[in-house]
Amino acid sequence: MLLPKRVKHRRQFRGSMAGKATRGNKITNGEFGIVATEPCWIKSNQIEAARVAMTRYIKRGGKVFIKIFPDKPVTGKPIGVRMGKGKGNLECWVAVVKPGRVMFEISGVAEETAREALRLATHKLPCKCKIVSRADLEGGDNSEN
């Protein structure tokens, strides 16, 4: 599972997920990708499950790129513990994903193989996603300007 090697502060505020992704919203390495359409937290084990689903489907061909990293710690208190007495223990690491963020990319395989592998990966993720190609995103940017 993915997690940071070391962090300056072990506990963070929850933060907000308002707005759209301004960075990481283009396909840079692969030909096809998964783009988030709603904001969510994606746990490190969900990222790993999506990666395994894709790599098992494409077998030896192609390459998978993971474009998100879980760098936000999430804490929780045990069930049956009263309020107060400090912040809870570290439970998991999450990646904060905003709408428009490219989460996974795939290259080196045929289009139908890539789309099926990405479809399998979207079922492992907690947010609504869409599968896009590099041409889709580049075409969308030109029409807006």
Swiss-Prot record:
Cellular component per GO, a single term: cytosolic large ribosomal subunit
Keyword terms of this UniProt record: Ribonucleoprotein, Ribosomal protein, RNA-binding, rRNA-binding, tRNA-binding
InterPro entries assigned:
Ribosomal_uL16, Ribosomal_uL16_bact-type, Ribosomal_uL16_CS, Ribosomal_uL16_dom, Ribosomal_uL16_sf
Q: Does the keyword tRNA-binding apply?
A: yes
Q: Does the keyword rRNA-binding apply?
A: yes
Which residues form each disulfide bond in the chain?
none
- Which biological processes are named by the entry's GO terms? translation
Entry GO MF terms: rRNA binding; structural constituent of ribosome; tRNA binding
Q: Which family does it belong to?
A: Belongs to the universal ribosomal protein uL16 family.
> Subunit arrangement?
Part of the 50S ribosomal subunit.
Role summary: Binds 23S rRNA and is also seen to make contacts with the A and possibly P site tRNAs.
Under the heading PANTHER family, the entry gives: 50S/60S RIBOSOMAL PROTEIN L16, LARGE RIBOSOMAL SUBUNIT PROTEIN UL16M
Name of this protein: Large ribosomal subunit protein uL16
Native organism is: Lachnospira eligens (strain ATCC 27750 / DSM 3376 / VPI C15-48 / C15-B4)
